[in-house]
């Protein structure tokens, strides 16, 4: 992928993520519990929903980021039940790459294994926040693979945010914005994301404790 185009695209995605983060209008809460809130609103990108999760994770910002960051050989594959593989297709800079993520079957196998090819940008902000910003791309080195339905992530990612005066806690805001593709009943998709996002936070908390205590 052309580096200049990749840089331009990724900065546009990061800007869109900031808009999602700042925009408080139109969100409807669909799941709450254990300190985690999941809400949604209709996507402007595809005929589906944009989901937003927010919760406090007990761990320093760097510890939490270490568990969620997109990295080959990283911890995410070890604890996230919705990720079975992560590979770099093209490394563009230290903070920008094209990746392939594979996911297992889900929802009692109604959702078959998926894979996603994304342009991913990591950004650090002046207040200490670290964000991962991703969107789907096509890449000649990663055509569709047998055994996987190719899904498409629209602008998505997460913000690991410091909590002033509480260095051992991190506010994690996540955005899931995924077209799972294939022929899936909408009610299956609508019930899958809020449940899986709630589990994501619970499993992440266990991972921070397991890998960083």
From Swiss-Prot:
Residues 1-213 form the START domain. Keywords: Lipid transport, Lipid-binding, Transport. PROSITE patterns: START. Pfam families: START. One of its GO terms (biological process) is cholesterol import. InterPro entries: StARD5/6, START-like_dom_sf, START_lipid-bd_dom. One of its GO terms (molecular function) is cholesterol binding. May be involved in the intracellular transport of sterols or other lipids. May bind cholesterol or other sterols. This is StAR-related lipid transfer protein 5. It comes from Pongo abelii. The gene is STARD5.
């Amino acid at each position: 992928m052309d580096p200049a185009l990749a840089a331009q695209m990724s900065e546009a995605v990061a800007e869109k993520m900031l808009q999602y983060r700042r925009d408080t209008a139109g969100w409807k809460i669909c799941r709450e519990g254990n300190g985690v809130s999941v809400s949604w609103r209709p996507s402007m990108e595809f005929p589906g929903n944009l989901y937003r999760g927010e919760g406090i994770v007990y761990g320093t910002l760097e510890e939490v980021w270490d568990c969620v960051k997109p990295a080959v050989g990283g911890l995410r594959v070890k604890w996230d039940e919705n990720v079975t593989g992560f590979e770099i297709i093209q490394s563009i800079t230290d903070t920008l790459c094209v990746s392939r993520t594979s996911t297992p079957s889900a929802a009692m196998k109604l959702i078959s294994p998926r894979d996603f090819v994304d342009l991913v940008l990591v950004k650090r902000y002046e207040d200490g926040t670290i964000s991962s910003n991703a969107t789907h791309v096509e890449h000649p080195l990663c055509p569709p693979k047998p055994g996987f339905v190719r899904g498409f992530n629209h602008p998505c990612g997460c913000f690991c945010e410091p909590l002033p005066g509480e260095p051992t806690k991190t506010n994690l805001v996540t955005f899931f914005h995924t077209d799972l593709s294939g022929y899936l009943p909408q009610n299956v998709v609508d019930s899958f994301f809020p449940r899986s996002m709630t589990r994501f936070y619970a499993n992440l908390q266990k991972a921070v404790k397991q890998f960083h205590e």
